[in-house]
Amino acid sequence: AIRIVNAQEKALTGLKIQCTLENGESATLTTDDVMPMMVRKVKFRIPGATSSKKGETKATVLLQDKSGKEIDRTEISLQQKDASSIHERTFISDVDGSVQYYSVNPSTTQGDNQALFLSVHGASVEARNQARAYAPKDWGHIIAPTNRRPFGFNWEEWGRIDAMEVLAEAEKVFKTDPAHTYLTGHSMGGHGTWFLGVTYPDRFAAIAPCASYPDIAKYSRPNADAANVGEKHLPMI
């Protein structure tokens, strides 16, 4: 996605965005309208590269009005990766039609029906960093959703929806085994692991929260966890 600034008093409708790689491959998409005096991040399509080149590549992004007239253009840098290496994927969210991304640390072996490890990140951590914190596995794919921005309400509310949208998308793309879907996370992601695990117990074979906190309301209170030790329903290890 890319931000468009409409600094005029009339709406921009029927916009098209053309993305052209440095090798000439191109893709055009009719994108979202931008209302007057508004900044909006809108979707565009990057053409699937047919070359085997890896590393940085340049792309020109051209914004056109509905008549095909050029409004603006910019150049972006992309990292072209092999699907067997750690990489990012995008999808269109059902919440608001926006482009969201998740990171993939793929299995070192080929084939369907492998395990899926959903790893939810801590506060102010990007999915791309989360996925790269793990060594690749030979029996499953590590999938790291990025949430809505770095915090996303502690993986509750809209963060919860993002995590489950990514899970559904990754299951479809990698054709993983639903009986071997696991959930983990660290810090804020540890809280997310508890929250997602108890909200969707039928979706995960096991959960592993790390350095987590059980309750947002108690998170900022001094010695809040220590106060829970005496509660019989919440054993501390």
Predicted features along the sequence, with ranges:
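Active-site nucleophile loop of the alpha/beta-hydrolase fold
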Residues: N147, A208-K218
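Hydrolases whose catalytic domains are alpha/beta-hydrolase-1, hotdog thioesterase
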Residues: G192-L196
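Short edge beta-strand/loop segments characteristic of extracellular beta-sandwich folds
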Residues: I2-Q8
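A domain-start/cap signature at the N-terminus of enzymes
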Residues: L15, N23-Q114
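Short beta-strand element of the alpha/beta-hydrolase
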Residues: D112-A123
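Gly/Ser-rich "nucleophile elbow"/oxyanion-hole loop immediately N-terminal to the catalytic nucleophile
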Residues: T108-D112, E156-M188, V198-F204
